[in-house]
UniProtKB/Swiss-Prot annotation:
GO terms for molecular function: tRNA (guanine(37)-N1)-methyltransferase activity; tRNA methyltransferase activity. The gene is trmt5. InterPro entries: MeTrfase_TRM5/TYW2, SAM-dependent_MTases_sf, TRM5-TYW2-like_MTfase, TRM5/TYW2-like_N, tRNA_Gua_MeTrfase_euk. Its EC number is 2.1.1.228. This is tRNA (guanine(37)-N(1))-methyltransferase. Involved in mitochondrial tRNA methylation. Specifically methylates the N1 position of guanosine-37 in various tRNAs. Methylation is not dependent on the nature of the nucleoside 5' of the target nucleoside. This is the first step in the biosynthesis of wybutosine (yW), a modified base adjacent to the anticodon of tRNAs and required for accurate decoding. It comes from the Eukaryota.
Length: 480
C-alpha cells in the first residue's frame, strides 16, 4: 500500500508506508531554523506592561504615545550586599528591555533621592511578586541571610517606547482580534517580510518598529508579489530604512554578497545546503544546474570538489562569479549563463563522458523546486552509446520539487519518473526539506541516473527527440 500522509498542525504523521524509495526527514526543529520569530496572540497577557490603549490604530509611528507610568513592586536592599542580593533574587527581578532593575529611592517629592547612598531598590516582576508572602523558599532564605526584611513597596515606573518589545507594540497598534506578526527573514542588513492584507495599512509603522528593535537591521522590505518572473526574484517595497539592496550574508562559514532585489536567496535553506555539501568528498564533481549566487557551488568548491555551476539570471551569474572570487575558489568553478536544458545538453554533455570514466562521484544538483522535475527530461538519451557502459560512473541526481499533494513523497517520485520515462523503484530516496506553506512542501528526490535513460538507444534520435528549450520559465513562490 502506498504511503498515506495526514497533516496536523503542520507536522507530518506517516500512518502507513510501503514504497520502493526511502524517506528521510530532518528534525522538525531544523525546518524552522531561520531568523524568523512569529508572534501568537495566545501568548500570556502582558498585564502592567501593555502599551497604552490609545495607540490602537496608529499608522504613523509616534514613539511618545507609548509613554506611561505603572506601579511595580520593589524591595529595599543595602548597597553593601546589593550585588549578592540581586543575584539571589534574579528569578523574581523585573526584566524589561531598556530598564534598569536597580534604582534609587524616591524622596517625598517623587524625585530620586540621590543623597541616599546606603540603600537601593530592586524592581520585582509583578507577575511573580504580588505581596511580601510571594517569595519562594530560596529567595526568602537569601533575604533572611542578608538580614533584609521581606517588605514590598510600590515604585512608580516610567515606561517609554524603548521598554516594549516589537511584538508588544504591534499587538497594541494593529486591529484587535486579527493576526499580528513581527516575523521576518534576515538577509544581511535586510529584513524581508511577507505581510498579510490586513497589515498593509500599518506597513510603514511595522517596518520602523522592526528596525528600532533589531540591531543591525537597516532596511525592511515587503514582498509585493509572488515569484513569477523568469529569474525567481520578486518585486518588493521598502517599508523603512535605507534602500541599499546589496546584502552581505555568511552561511555555514561562507560569505556571500548579492543584490537581494535582483536574485533569489532564501535563508531558510541553510540546513539543506549544508546537508547536500556533507555528502561530498574531495575530488568529486558537482554539477549545479540552477546555481543562483552559489549556496551549493561555493561550499562544494571549498570542500575540494570540481564544480560546473550555471544560472539563467545574468545577475545571479554575475554574483556567482563574484562570490567565487570572494571565497577564493574561482579556479575550481566553471560558470555558465544558460537555460538549464541548454546547460545539460551543452557543457554537461561535453564533460560527462570523461568524468564518468573516473572513480570520483558526480553529483547533479537541481534546485528550482517549481520546475526542476520537468528539466529531468534533458538527460534522456544525452550520451551516445559506448562499448562498455557497465564501467561508467553514473551521476547521482538531487532534484527539488514542490508538492501540494496528500502524499508529497509519492508525488515527486512519480513526476520524476514521468520526466525520465523510467521506473525509479529501488533507486531513490526522498527528503522532506521544509514546509513552505499550509499544504505545500519542498521535497528533494535523490537517485542514480539510470543507464537506460542517460545513454541514447538505437530508437532515439537526439535531433528529433529534443524539444525547443523555453528561455523563460515561470516560477511559483518558494518563500510564502
Amino acid at each position: 500500500m502506498a504511503a498515506v500522509w495526514r497533516r496536523s498542525a503542520r507536522l507530518f504523521i506517516l500512518l502507513q508506508r510501503h514504497h520502493s524509495c526511502t524517506f528521510t526527514s530532518q528534525n522538525l526543529n531544523h525546518f524552522m531554523r531561520s531568523q524568523k520569530v512569529m508572534t501568537d496572540q495566545s501568548q500570556t497577557d502582558l498585564g502592567l506592561f501593555k502599551p497604552p490603549s490609545t495607540v490602537r490604530g496608529m499608522t504613523e509611528l509616534d514613539r511618545s504615545a507609548f509613554n506611561q507610568t505603572v506601579s511595580v513592586p520593589a524591595i529595599r536592599l543595602p548597597t553593601n550586599i546589593l550585588n549578592k542580593a540581586v543575584k539571589s533574587l534574579k528569578k523574581v527581578a523585573l526584566q524589561r528591555p531598556g530598564l534598569k532593575r536597580v534604582v534609587e529611592e524616591h524622596s517625598e517629592d517623587g524625585n530620586a533621592d540621590c543623597g541616599n547612598i546606603e540603600h537601593r531598590l530592586l524592581l520585582l516582576d509583578p507577575n511573580s511578586i504580588t505581596s511580601s508572602d510571594s517569595f519562594g523558599s530560596d529567595e526568602a532564605e537569601a533575604l533572611k541571610a542578608y538580614s533584609v526584611p521581606q517588605e514590598i513597596q510600590s515604585y512608580e515606573l516610567k515606561l517609554t517606547y524603548e521598554n516594549f518589545k516589537s511584538e508588544e507594540i504591534l499587538r497594541a497598534v494593529l486591529p484587535e482580534g486579527q493576526g499580528v506578526t513581527s516575523g521576518f527573514s534576515r538577509v544581511g542588513h535586510i529584513a524581508h517580510m511577507n505581510l498579510r492584507e490586513h497589515q498593509l495599512p500599518y506597513r510603514k509603522l511595522i517596518g520602523q518598529v522592526i528596525i528600532d528593535k533589531n540591531p543591525g537591521i537597516t532596511c525592511v522590505v515587503n514582498k509585493t508579489n509572488t515569484i513569477d518572473s523568469t529569474y525567481r526574484n520578486f518585486q518588493m517595497e521598502v517599508l523603512a530604512g535605507e534602500s541599499n539592496m546589496v546584502a552581505k550574508v555568511r552561511e555555514n562559514g561562507v560569505l556571500y554578497e548579492f543584490d537581494f532585489s535582483r536574485v533569489y536567496w532564501n535563508p531558510r535553506l541553510s540546513t539543506e545546503h549544508e546537508r547536500i555539501v556533507s555528502l561530498l568528498h574531495r575530488g568529486d564533481t558537482v554539477v549545479d544546474v540552477f546555481a543562483g549566487v552559489g549556496p551549493f557551488a561555493i561550499p562544494a568548491a571549498r570542500r575540494g570538489c570540481a564544480v560546473l555551476a550555471n544560472d539563467l539570471n545574468p545577475e545571479s551569474f554575475r554574483w556567482l562569479q563574484h562570490n567565487a572570487k570572494l571565497n577564493k575558489v574561482d579556479q575550481k568553478i566553471t560558470t555558465s549563463n544558460l537555460d538549464g536544458r541548454d546547460f545539460i545538453r551543452g557543457p554537461v554533455r561535453e564533460r560527462l563522458p570523461a568524468l564518468m570514466k573516473g572513480s570520483q562521484k558526480i553529483h547533479v544538483v537541481m534546485n528550482l523546486p517549481a520546475l526542476a522535475l520537468e528539466f529531468l527530461d534533458a538527460f534522456k538519451g544525452l550520451l551516445d552509446p559506448e562499448p562498455d557502459q557497465s564501467l561508467s560512473n553514473l551521476p547521482q541526481v538531487h532534484c527539488y520539487g514542490f508538492s501540494k499533494e496528500n502524499d508529497p513523497q509519492r508525488d515527486v517520485v512519480e513526476r520524476a519518473e514521468a520526466s525520465l520515462k523510467t521506473n525509479l523503484q529501488g533507486q531513490c530516496s526522498v527528503h522532506l526539506v521544509r514546509n513552505v506553506a499550509p499544504n505545500k512542501e519542498m521535497m528533494c528526490v535523490s537517485f542514480t541516473l539510470p543507464r537506460g535513460v542517460l545513454y541514447k538507444t538505437h530508437t532515439q534520435d537526439r535531433d528529433t527527440s529534443e524539444e525547443p528549450c523555453p528561455k523563460k520559465q515561470k516560477c511559483e513562490d518558494s518563500t510564502n
